[in-house]
């Protein structure tokens, strides 16, 4: 099949998905020719799309042709991503038209339908690459804190050597300033920065400020969205943060929304641009119950719950978002300066602050619910990466920061674990597991953990994969306990209640009494 016929199939896909109308066919065809540098197309016989062909299958022969004819540097993930965004950008109308359609759907059918359609649209134009996301491995594990969700992340492509070399040669630029800036919309991209011709964002007003809604190209849960500030300003938790989160819920009540903490170690991977993450998912933490419920003396109509969770979580509920934001700010300001030597909590080292929060908001019927997760980023000699961070004993599984998504009970584990766990399973079923584990460079770092697992579990060839997945879930629960500022011990729970006393809270009921 010729390149012209492959492009005709891509046009048919666009028509079938209603990305373009029949009146856009010639215009879009010419844009595709321009994108590929085709100046003298040969006449073609119209080719109808095979219904079984997915978008990645339609794009594959175009990549091959582009690489063979010098239109693409190399047939690798980096260059394929740049070309696919350029090609699919030919099907995407101006931002104003995407916004108009979104707002029209929202007005006629409500925000839930509008976000659902916009999500589908983001998939159809290949901004969300479902073929990549499908590679991720998912499972759940029951624990004392409820069922935790586990993911091995295989969706982010590795940079190929050619692209890495090209990136070193390329002139550094500050446009767009980061991956979240609104200037990414329609951006051509480079080996250093993803192409975004097929990317669109929806304006949202939060507390009289301009923010934007988009979806994450690396979806970790249903309708995983990012809400970003219009201006490139750093992450900062304040009363305004709580007000913005609750304002968003007023407009999109079917989503949860949360913010990463604003300090290194306990924050997310991007601290330079203020943003939230949300979506249509009920996380394990949201399903966790409050062990104790309190009234706050100065905030009538707002209840405070101590959540049964490995991290230290206070749950506010109220029907007035303004009152909930006031109570959240009270907790935050109290925590910012709170120290408890017996619990190992120090608010400051000199002038350097350590205490902050990870806030997560959702609607619960008519109520506004705001979880305040207490965080501290202090380090010491024993824990140079963070005292309330995954400890050395679990680094063979994960040593990265515990951000918003993991705080809520969804583990995002590194892709290396897929092969390492496969090798670990084989070693555990071998004649000499200890030697097999210790001599294999892929499993040596897991050997102590794997041998301990063997001592407490009966392992067979039939159940080894399940046992490993369950034990990874238990490691994740322990990682969350490490990140918790008040520990799951009698002393830790007592220390947590000392902090609650500082808030002026009065007990109402307890599941423990």
Curated annotation (Swiss-Prot):
It is found in: Cytoplasm. Disulfide bonds: none annotated. One of its GO terms (molecular function) is UDP-glucose:hexose-1-phosphate uridylyltransferase activity. One of its GO terms (biological process) is galactose metabolic process. It catalyses: alpha-D-galactose 1-phosphate + UDP-alpha-D-glucose = alpha-D-glucose 1-phosphate + UDP-alpha-D-galactose. Its EC number is 2.7.7.12. It is an enzyme of class 2 (transferase). Pathway: Carbohydrate metabolism; galactose metabolism. One of its GO terms (cellular component) is cytoplasm. Pfam families: GalP_UDP_tr_C (PF02744), GalP_UDP_transf (PF01087). It comes from the Bacteria. Keywords: Carbohydrate metabolism, Cytoplasm, Galactose metabolism, Nucleotidyltransferase, Transferase. Belongs to the galactose-1-phosphate uridylyltransferase type 2 family. This is Galactose-1-phosphate uridylyltransferase. It comes from Bacillus subtilis (strain 168). The gene is galT.
């Amino acid at each position: 099949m010729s390149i012209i016929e492959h492009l005709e199939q891509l046009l048919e896909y666009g028509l079938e998905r209603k990305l373009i109308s029949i009146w856009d066919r010639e215009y879009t065809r010419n844009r595709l020719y321009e994108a590929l540098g085709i100046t003298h197309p040969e006449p073609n016989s119209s080719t109808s799309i095979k219904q079984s062909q997915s978008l990645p299958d339609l794009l594959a022969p175009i990549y091959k042709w582009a690489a063979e004819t010098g239109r693409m540097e190399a047939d690798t993930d980096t260059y394929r991503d740049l070309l696919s965004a350029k090609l699919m950008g030919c099907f995407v109308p101006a931002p104003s038209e995407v916004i108009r359609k979104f707002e029209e759907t929202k007005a006629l059918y409500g925000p839930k339908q509008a976000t659902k359609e916009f999500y589908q649209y983001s998939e159809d134009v290949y901004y969300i690459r479902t073929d990549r996301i499908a590679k991720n491995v998912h499972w759940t594990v029951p624990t004392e804190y409820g069922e935790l969700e586990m993911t091995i992340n295989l969706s982010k492509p590795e940079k190929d050597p050619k692209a890495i070399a090209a990136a070193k040669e390329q002139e550094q630029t500050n446009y767009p300033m980061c991956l979240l800036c609104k200037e990414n919309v329609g951006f051509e991209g480079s080996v250093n920065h993803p192409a975004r011709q097929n990317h669109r964002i929806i304006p949202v007003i939060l507390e009289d400020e301009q923010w934007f809604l988009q979806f994450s190209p690396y979806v970790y849960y249903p309708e995983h969205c990012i809400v970003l500030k219009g201006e490139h300003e750093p992450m900062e938790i304040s009363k305004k943060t709580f007000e913005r989160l609750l304002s968003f819920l007023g407009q999109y009540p079917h989503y949860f929304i949360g913010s990463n903490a604003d300090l290194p170690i306990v924050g997310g991977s991007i601290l330079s641009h203020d943003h939230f993450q949300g979506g249509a998912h009920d996380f394990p933490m949201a399903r966790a119950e409050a062990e104790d419920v309190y009234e706050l003396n100065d905030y009538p109509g707002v209840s405070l719950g101590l959540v049964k969770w490995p991290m230290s979580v206070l749950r506010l509920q109220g029907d007035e978002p303004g009152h909930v934001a006031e109570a959240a700010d009270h907790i935050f300001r109290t925590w910012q300066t709170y120290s408890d030597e017996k619990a190992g909590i120090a608010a400051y080292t000199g002038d350097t602050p350590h205490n902050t929060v990870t806030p997560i908001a959702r609607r619960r019927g008519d109520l506004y619910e705001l979880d305040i997760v207490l965080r501290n980023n202090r380090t010491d000699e024993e824990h140079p990466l963070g005292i309330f961070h995954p400890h050395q004993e679990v680094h063979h599984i994960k040593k990265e920061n515990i951000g918003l998504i993991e705080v809520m009970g969804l583990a995002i584990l590194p892709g290396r674990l897929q092969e390492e766990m496969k090798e670990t399973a084989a070693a555990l079923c071998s004649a000499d597991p200890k030697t097999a584990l210790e001599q294999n460079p892929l499993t040596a770092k897991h050997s102590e953990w794997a041998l301990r697992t063997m001592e407490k579990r009966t392992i067979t060839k039939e159940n080894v994969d399940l046992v490993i997945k369950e034990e990874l879930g238990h490691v994740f629960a322990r990682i969350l306990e490490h990140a918790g500022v008040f520990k799951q011990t009698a002393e830790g729970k007592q220390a947590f209640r000392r902090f609650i006393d500082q808030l002026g809270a009065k007990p109402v009921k307890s599941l423990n009494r």
